[in-house]
């Protein structure tokens, strides 16, 4: 990535600081930039597309995304700030959040991952409750930002679908393989359960330590994400919740983000202590991450017990 600083023409208000990433197929480059008027850091997305006659190819589709972002007002979605044409295409400016994508090398414990999941679901609830509703269509680790305080932000609405089916932006791909729900891959009708699949796949990557580019290694021959054996220390209820999030058939997932969130809230992520009963003793074993503790309570008579703990 380039670290050189230069000013974009014809709008000198924004000065690029460094390149953050690019999508060659889509002709998009993302920069961290500076607003020379407000002195604030911003995110500047630069789109390049061919000029056909007097019409910009894809301009109306890009304009549609701007309309979507302008209407969104949620603390978990960076605000749209500005947009303008350039000689080679088009630029869009958004609020900058000092947060890293989940694809960046970091580690979270299961409780933190549950909190991240709940935060993303709250954003999806907001999008799904809008009229018309918004389906993001590209939920993956790269598009979920998390800061040091575990504040969560959902970015990149370039593939968003609004209402009955109009896509916010023309694109070569309709998502990211491994995180796309099967109905996206096969161009079937999308609904509120579609984004749940991408979130579930993202959480599985975090919990299993799988890089997003290697998620294909988790699929079995039937096209299902096979992750259960990799999470022996997580509660069965949480594993079942994850499994429901990534069911291949949309009808077998939670119907929407609201239902998924309500099902997640009461779940204890780590596996609860195992209790074994016998005629003379009760044995307690914890299986939480990083801890192994065995407690043995001897029963010597109905009115007298002896206890010992081994850690």
Report residues per predicted region.
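Conserved short submotifs of the Hanks-type protein kinase catalytic core
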Residues: 87-101
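Conserved catalytic-loop aspartate of Hanks-type protein kinases
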Residues: 195
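Conserved activation segment of eukaryotic-like protein kinases, specifically the C-terminal portion
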Residues: 169-183
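Activation segment signature within eukaryotic-like protein kinase domains
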Residues: 116-117
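AlphaC helix of the eukaryotic protein kinase fold
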Residues: 51-71
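Catalytic-loop of the protein kinase fold
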Residues: 128-146
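Activation-segment/catalytic-loop signature of the eukaryotic protein kinase fold
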Residues: 83
